[in-house]
Amino acid sequence: MLHAVETAFYQKHVLVVGDLMLDRYLWGDVTRISPEAPVPVVHMQRESHRCGGAANVASNLAKLGLHTSIVGFVGEDSDGQVLISALQESGIDTHGILPLAGWSTITKTRVIGGHQQILRMDRETPLADTAHASQLLHQQVMPMLEGEQRPHVIILSDYAKGVLSFELCQALIVRARNLGIPVLVDPKGRDYARYRHATALSPNRGELRGVTGVEDGDLNTLLDAGESLRQSLDVAFLAVTLSEQGIALVDGSEHPRRIPAMAQEVYDVSGAGDTVIATLGAGLAAGLTRLDALHLANLAAGVVVGKLGTAAIDLNELRGALLTDATYEQSDKIANWAHAKQQIARWHAQGEKVVFTNGCFDLLHAGHVTYLEHARRLGQRLVLGLNTDASVSRLKGPERPLIQEQDRARVLAALAAVDLVVLFEQDTPLELIEQLRPDILAKGADYREDQVVGGDLVRRWGGRVALVQLVQGRSTTGIVQRISAQK
């Protein structure tokens, strides 16, 4: 997935608007308890600073390679300068940051002893005149939506510090909607009216409980309430973060789609929500579907919670997470008939169209890969029925297959276009098709529709047959013949 979007990241511009914060860390060791009070004594060793709040969202985007601009307030103080410098060092455009007189840069200072957070001290000053502040930001941000340099995605990072007023949010969302720019919101508080007509909201479980009033009940009840909220706000989808249970996509489908958590170890959840909204925005800007973008965001969150303190993810870490994920997914993609039937039922429940194709796929070549990619585009999922070795021998002769069935299945499962590989030992896939009940039956364009095995069955339950163009001059038989001729 990342290979397909990495180049797009570098070509996309994301604008972040919200509450800027500086995270300060005081690192040391704890070896004793104070004689003055029952508190640990921390022997200070070093101090570090990181971007927090909306600044951390921007930091994640920049580390993923996107052109990133940020708009918000800092105070006319040294912490504000430290934060601006940190953003600029990450390559983030800070021209939209306004120093605000009489206001302190929001700073969170954490004392860390022996890799354990001992204390957090917050310094923040309430905005004295929120209407004036909103007007200043309005004047700053609205011109950034116009012209050739306008963003591909806007992210509103709301920490309820008074920066994202109702008036500012609605002005941004309405103008962006008219321009076709998606607006993603990491929300706060119990009044979500300010986010009406946004593209997506990413509340966590607690935030969704707070705004919907569903304090008790199971997760399904909460997600049902989330769907009602989505409809009332005219929002395209909710990405509900569920800690150890992953992320749920609430978008009007019959059942919310769940993406399981991928974290191996959890050290610190600070900033995980920032990483989710940033990676989701990056994925959508790069052209991913909302489900694929959320899958990417879920992997990214699994990386950052394994770090101590507020942290951002970079491309190398995301590559590693995707490789690990692909390793696990590959074995899961090879299924028996019963498992395949269950998985397809789940996809159907999520409103996804399932494409089925079949073949021997002996000596996988570029023609096969192109065919499978085209077949996958006919729906949302591609199931590949693979002839067993015995079946191939009956069809192709005793010298075939050249590659054993488990090896063929393993290679095919590694392809991004293939969602499931199912072996069948019959001469035709008719029985398998009857069991799996796909929506679309794909076959090479060297067949006629009336020649496609299972076509009548699929049409009977409302599906269709699709003929896919083949790459000329590419076939396993041709390769085998050329090899034999050279002996």
Curated annotation (Swiss-Prot):
It catalyses: D-glycero-beta-D-manno-heptose 7-phosphate + ATP = D-glycero-beta-D-manno-heptose 1,7-bisphosphate + ADP + H(+); D-glycero-beta-D-manno-heptose 1-phosphate + ATP + H(+) = ADP-D-glycero-beta-D-manno-heptose + diphosphate. ATP binds at N204, R205, G206, E207. Residues 1-329 are annotated as: Ribokinase. Pathway: Nucleotide-sugar biosynthesis; ADP-L-glycero-beta-D-manno-heptose biosynthesis; ADP-L-glycero-beta-D-manno-heptose from D-glycero-beta-D-manno-heptose 7-phosphate: step 1/4; Nucleotide-sugar biosynthesis; ADP-L-glycero-beta-D-manno-heptose biosynthesis; ADP-L-glycero-beta-D-manno-heptose from D-glycero-beta-D-manno-heptose 7-phosphate: step 3/4. The active site is at D274. InterPro entries: Bifunc_HldE, Carboh/pur_kinase_PfkB_CS, Cyt_trans-like, PfkB_dom, RfaE_dom_I, RfaE_dom_II, Ribokinase-like, Rossmann-like_a/b/a_fold. GO terms for cellular component: cytosol. It is an enzyme of class 2 (transferase). GO terms for molecular function: ATP binding; heptose 7-phosphate kinase activity; heptose-1-phosphate adenylyltransferase activity; phosphotransferase activity, alcohol group as acceptor. Keywords: ATP-binding, Carbohydrate metabolism, Kinase, Multifunctional enzyme, Nucleotide-binding, Nucleotidyltransferase, Transferase. The keyword Cell membrane does not apply. GO terms for biological process: ADP-L-glycero-beta-D-manno-heptose biosynthetic process. Residues 356-487 are annotated as: Cytidylyltransferase. Its EC number is 2.7.1.167, 2.7.7.70. In the N-terminal section; belongs to the carbohydrate kinase PfkB family. In the C-terminal section; belongs to the cytidylyltransferase family. Homodimer. Catalyzes the ADP transfer from ATP to D-glycero-beta-D-manno-heptose 1-phosphate, yielding ADP-D-glycero-beta-D-manno-heptose. This is Bifunctional protein HldE. The lineage of its organism: Bacteria, Pseudomonadati, Pseudomonadota, Alphaproteobacteria, Magnetococcales.
